[in-house]
Amino acid sequence: MLAARTGAAGSQISEENTKLRRQSGFSVAGKDKSPKKASENAKDSSLSPSGESQLRARQLALLREVEMNWYLKLCDLSSEHTTVCTTGMPHRNLGKSGLRVSCLGLGTWVTFGGQISDEVAERLMTIAYESGVNLFDTAEVYAAGKAEVILGSIIKKKGWRRSSLVITTKLYWGGKAETERGLSRKHIIEGLKGSLQRLQLEYVDVVFANRPDSNTPMEEIVRAMTHVINQGMAMYWGTSRWSAMEIMEAYSVARQFNMIPPVCEQAEYHLFQREKVEVQLPELYHKIGVGAMTWSPLACGIISGKYGNGVPESSRASLKCYQWLKERIVSEEGRKQQNKLKDLSPIAERLGCTLPQLAVAWCLRNEGVSSVLLGSSTPEQLIENLGAIQVLPKMTSHVVNEIDNILRNKPYSKKDYRS
C-alpha cells in the first residue's frame, strides 16, 4: 500500500526534493554543489572549530527541513502540523545521539511534591507541553519519590502520546537502607524499576546516574546501565554531577567491553557558573559525543531578582533545607552578583525582555547545550521563562560580549576541539 501511495506521487516528490536540495546549496552528503569564488573557498578553509560546527549545524538543520518537507508532502500535510511550527520551540539532538529534545525542558526539583500543589504541577506541565516542551526531568530522590508519582499521574491523566515525550529520571538516593542508594548493579536495576512503577511507565528515555559513586567499580555501573537499556527499561543513559575524567572512564569501559556509553551530562549552568559547560564538556562532546543538559539557569532563583532586597518568605531560600542557598545570597559574593545583575538590566530592557529571559536565552546561545531545564513554581514564572525562545535570535555576538564584559568570568580553554 505504501508502494502504491509513493508510486507516481513519490517520483514527483523526489524531483521536488532534489530541487530543494539544489536550492539549499548542498547534497545529502553535505557536499557543496554551488559554485564558489576562490576567495570564498579560502575563507571556508580557514574556519575556526566553532565556525565549522556552526556551519555543519546549519547544514544539518537545512537538510532536516528538506526531509521534513518531503515527509509532509508524502502524507498530504502542511508544515502547520509540526510542533516546531505551531509552538516555535526549537529542538536539538541530545549530544551526538539521535534523540531530539526541546531546547527547554521542565524540571521537578523542589517544586513537584514539595513547594507546589498537584494542581499547580498539572498546570505547569500543560503549559510546557502546549508550548512545545517534550522533555520532563525528575529523580527518585525528589520529594522522596513523590515527584515521580505526580509526573506520571499527570501524563496518564492528560493522555499524551508516550512517543511524543522525553521522560528522564535520576538514580542514586533511593532510600535509607545501604542497598537503596548508590550505583551498584542492584540499586540501578531495582531503583529504576521503582521509578517506573511510580511514573506508571514502561520505560524512561534517559536514566541518569545522579552523582558518581566511588564505592562501585565503573565497570559494574556501565554494565548495569547497559542491562537496563537492553531490557527496554531505558533508551539511553547519562551522568549528572560527574567530572570529565569520570565520564571519560565510563566511555572507555563501555568501548572496552562492547557496552553502551553515556550520551549526556546534566550540569549546573548559568551566568555565574560556566567552567564545566563551556570548557570541559565541549571536549567530551567532540571526542565521545556526550552532550550537555543544563539545570538552574537562574542560579536557584538568584538571577530572578527576587533576592535583591533580602530573602522573601515564600522563596526557595526560605525553606529549612535550603539554608545553604540563603547563606550564598547574603554572602559577599552574593552581593557582588546582585550588583552585576543590576548592570545587566539595561541590556534586558534594550532587548525588550526580562532579566530571567535574558539569562535563559544566554544559556541557549551555547550550541553545545542540548536542553536547559526550567524550574518554575508558578504558571507566570514558566510562561516568562519560556519567552526566552523569542530572545534567543537577539543574542548576537555583540550582546554576548557586552554580558561578558559585565560578568568578567568567561573561562578560557587553551585547546581547540574539532569534531
UniProtKB/Swiss-Prot annotation:
It catalyses: a primary alcohol + NADP(+) = an aldehyde + NADPH + H(+); a secondary alcohol + NADP(+) = a ketone + NADPH + H(+). NADP(+) binds at residues 108-109, 115, 137, 210, 240-241, 266, 295-300, 306, 316, 375, 377, 381, 384-385. It comes from the Eukaryota. In brain, expression is most prominent in caudate nucleus, hippocampus and thalamus. Significant expression also detected in amygdala and subthalamic nucleus. Also expressed in both healthy and cardiomyopathic heart. Up to four times more abundant in left ventricle than left atrium. Disulfide bonds: none annotated. The keyword tRNA processing does not apply. Changing R316E: Nearly abolishes NADPH binding. Its main location: cytoplasm. Residues 30-43 have a biased composition (Basic and acidic residues). One of its GO terms (biological process) is potassium ion transport. GO terms for molecular function: aldo-keto reductase (NADPH) activity; carbonyl reductase (NADPH) activity; molecular function inhibitor activity; NADPH binding; potassium channel regulator activity; protein domain specific binding; transmembrane transporter binding; voltage-gated potassium channel activity. The active site is at Y142. Regulatory subunit of the voltage-gated potassium (Kv) Shaker channels composed of pore-forming and potassium-conducting alpha subunits and of regulatory beta subunits. The beta-1/KCNAB1 cytoplasmic subunit mediates closure of delayed rectifier potassium channels by physically obstructing the pore via its N-terminal domain and increases the speed of channel closure for other family members. Promotes the inactivation of Kv1.1/KCNA1, Kv1.2/KCNA2, Kv1.4/KCNA4, Kv1.5/KCNA5 and Kv1.6/KCNA6 alpha subunit-containing channels. Homotetramer. Interaction with tetrameric potassium channel alpha subunits gives rise to a heterooctamer. Identified in potassium channel complexes containing KCNA1, KCNA2, KCNA4, KCNA5, KCNA6, KCNAB1 and KCNAB2. Part of a complex containing KCNA1, KCNA4 and LGI1; interaction with LGI1 inhibits down-regulation of KCNA1 channel activity. Interacts with the dimer formed by GNB1 and GNG2; this enhances KCNA1 binding. Interacts with SQSTM1. Belongs to the shaker potassium channel beta subunit family. The N-terminal domain of the beta subunit mediates closure of delayed rectifier potassium channels by physically obstructing the pore. This is Voltage-gated potassium channel subunit beta-1. It comes from Homo sapiens (Human). The gene is KCNAB1.
